[in-house]
């Protein structure tokens, strides 16, 4: 691959939509996520903060959570640039990539995707957890309502202005390396963006569908939450897919062993780039299926039986 590295000053589709710039971080106690409620207090102290631990048994059935329609996710020329932001790896998407359905209120434009990870096999780094389990990585596709015309400044002021598609990533079993091919191609660009603000044009044919191979995109969890980085705007319809993407461990390890958080190679490697689980605020997490009316009826019946037993003992 030709090394065409450019350092840019202008922003394309921001990952964080943050007004606080470099004032927040993951790696330093003076600016890590324990301080964000002070750094960006307007939203990071909110009542619908993300990420969350999803308790699968508590997810409420919702028959409106139908299948999505993905536009241009199969197009292998929609990935424009890949960039080291100093906090993640972000891939900018070309116009026309969209998602609708899945009980979303309108068509959403897919703007970019980025990733969260820990530190190789020693620290898993997904943001969301399911029943307390944290996956090695998590991919987020960030989408904005088409009615905002790509204006993320207005989108973050709309309680459902953004839709985030979250995909867990786990290691393939066995000793596979360099797999799947699409991920092998994507991660081959990391060597060209080792330092903060470096980016390179993506010239290989890669589609979103190829990166999401093996995921049943009809099975997911849904809740209303926030951006997981400052300013933590509570403007996100979260969809977290149940099936993980399977990637060979050697490719997962590249993220925590190749990228640096600053503009020089002596700066720290980019590890543990995820926000910790946020305190419970009575989120309603839904999933496909009918509401568990039978379960509530059973609970009511058991309650009446208990009351009757107590009255008999009086």
Annotate each language-model stretch with its function.
Residues 2-314:
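Alpha-carbonic anhydrase
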């Amino acid at each position: 691959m030709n090394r065409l590295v450019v350092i840019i000053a202008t922003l394309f589709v921001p990952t964080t939509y943050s007004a606080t710039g470099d004032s927040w971080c993951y790696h330093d106690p003076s600016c890590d996520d324990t301080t964000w409620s002070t750094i960006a207090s307007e939203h990071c102290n909110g009542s619908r903060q993300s990420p969350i631990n999803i308790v699968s048994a508590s997810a409420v059935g919702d028959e409106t959570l139908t299948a999505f329609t993905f536009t241009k996710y199969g197009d292998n020329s929609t990935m424009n640039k890949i960039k080291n932001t100093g906090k993640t790896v972000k891939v900018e998407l070309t116009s026309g990539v969209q998602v609708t359905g899945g009980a979303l209120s309108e068509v959403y434009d897919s703007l970019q995707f980025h990733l969260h990870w820990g530190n190789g096999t020693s620290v898993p780094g997904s943001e969301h957890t399911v029943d307390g389990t944290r996956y090695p990585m998590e991919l987020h596709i960030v989408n904005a309502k088409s009615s905002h015309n790509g204006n993320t400044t207005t989108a973050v002021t709309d309680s459902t202005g953004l839709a985030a598609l979250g995909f867990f990533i786990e290691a393939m079993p066995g000793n596979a390396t360099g797999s799947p091919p699409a991920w092998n191609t994507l991660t081959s660009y990391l060597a060209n963006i080792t330092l903060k603000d470096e980016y390179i044009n993506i010239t290989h044919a890669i589609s979103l569908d190829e990166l999401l191979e093996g995921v049943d995109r009809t099975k997911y969890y849904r809740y209303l939450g926030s951006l997981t980085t400052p300013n933590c705007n509570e403007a996100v319809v979260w969809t977290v897919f149940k099936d993980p993407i399977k990637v060979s461990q050697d490719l997962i390890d590249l993220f925590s062993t190749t990228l640096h958080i600053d503009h020089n190679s002596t700066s720290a490697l980019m590890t543990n780039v995820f926000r910790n689980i946020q305190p419970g605020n009575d989120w309603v997490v839904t999933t496909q299926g009918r509401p568990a009316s039978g379960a509530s009826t059973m609970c009511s019946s058991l309650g009446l039986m208990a009351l009757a037993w107590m009255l008999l003992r009086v």
